[in-house]
Amino acid sequence: MYDVIVVGGGSAGAAVAARLSEDPARRVLLLEAGRDWRADEAPWEVRTPNPIPIIHKREYQEKWQWPDLLSRRVAGQESRFYWRGKGLGGSSMMNGQIAIRGVADAFDEWAALGCTGWSAKDVMPLFSVIEDDLEFGAAEGHGRGGPLPVYRAPPETWGPIDRGLRDAALASGYPWCADLNGPDGEGVACYPINSRNNRRFSTNEGYLEPARGRANLEIRGHALVDRVLISDGRATGLRVHIEGQGTHEISARQIVLSAGAIHSPAILLRSGIGPADELKAMGISVARDLPVGRHFFDHPLFRATIQLHDKLRPIDPDTRHTNCCVTYSSGLADGGKRDMILIAFNHRGIGNPGAIGAGLFNAYSRGTLKLASTDPSVDPVVEENMLADPRDMLRMMDAVKRLAVITSQPALSGIADWIRLADTDLTLPQAAHLPDHELDAVLRRETGDIQHAAGSCRMSGFGDANGVVNPDGTVKGISGLRVADASIMPSDCRANTHFTTVVIGEAIARMMVR
């Protein structure tokens, strides 16, 4: 029997499996639905610092993602493909590599919601543990020697829209920020990314490669978990479909679900853990009535397309899509510190136009995730419900007006044939001058997401029935079962979610070995 089975080898799961297996007396099995791959075997689409091909090309979606997973971003839109990594490294092997820390105030909010052990003083030191910051590692509050390199591309390597956004935002009065992960990390900045020697560095390379020689760590790829086996209120194992080997039941003393904000809740629902009415409607016996899938959120993003002058268009397939961003506090609608981000997109695929975008880093709208079938090979139904909360719409409207000012600066207007919204064909100044009800309608058409799924197995205080897991990651009312990934976020971390998700894995692993 295994001591622990970890489900999912992504941003959090790789950290959990690696940390728990540091004790040679603890037998750990890591199950990954996608392929088990080695760093020295990684093909170009996984190595390149440009994530656009692996995200958008169908052949790579089928190889490295869940190709049939859809979500509806905003009510009234059609459901579209939702990219999530499938393979060791999870979404860290196909995301934008962004390594931004969550905001200290956000973690203090988690603690205020009853999540003891998740305040800024508890969480922020773990960011130093996981990083190998090549530029600021020796500075107070930073780290060197951790499993994940943090790199900032020198400005001379940036793309034209990176430089345009930087110069236009500075000219518009936004301050320069040398270190976005510093205590006052807000302003015009270079993205910190997980990269080494101009190649992506996922949690597979950072955590699992160094741990592979351990006799007590077993890694199995192409292992699709159907459900958790539960007896008398205790998790006893898993029912798993292993490619080429059929279906097996595997026993363990403890189970940790780190399958991500889409598939961890789906596994719980198939296991009879979730809203009782939904489970009964699917013919699933109820093991525990909990609000699984009821708190889903992502970061809304709208983009204006930028058609660069011919001579400025990138031609190197390894050109990064973005190096520069602007983070700021809107001062509106309970946004809090660093609730917004503006993003440069040098291209959306080599040969295609670039863009400039604005997104929420503190989203209040909440969506749902529900089963479409009890078959584990069928992805769940995701309704993101973006912009439903008026606090989100108000700040997105303000961002349109900010971008209208920034894109009028010569640093951006001077490099473009045109800049306009993709669906409505409006320029940003035109959109900014619309009456509120018309701008509302435009944003509902134009808004997508940043692929930062979170919140679907929400953490709440011990004894608080409004959550799915307790502050130690244990599923409420079920012994021997935890969740450790972005799905447990009780509210927004106000950053790209990858780095905070790794920290969640580190934190839960530490709680398990105390």
Where are these regions (language model features)?
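N-terminal redox-cofactor-binding region of secreted/periplasmic oxidoreductases
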Residues: M1-R514
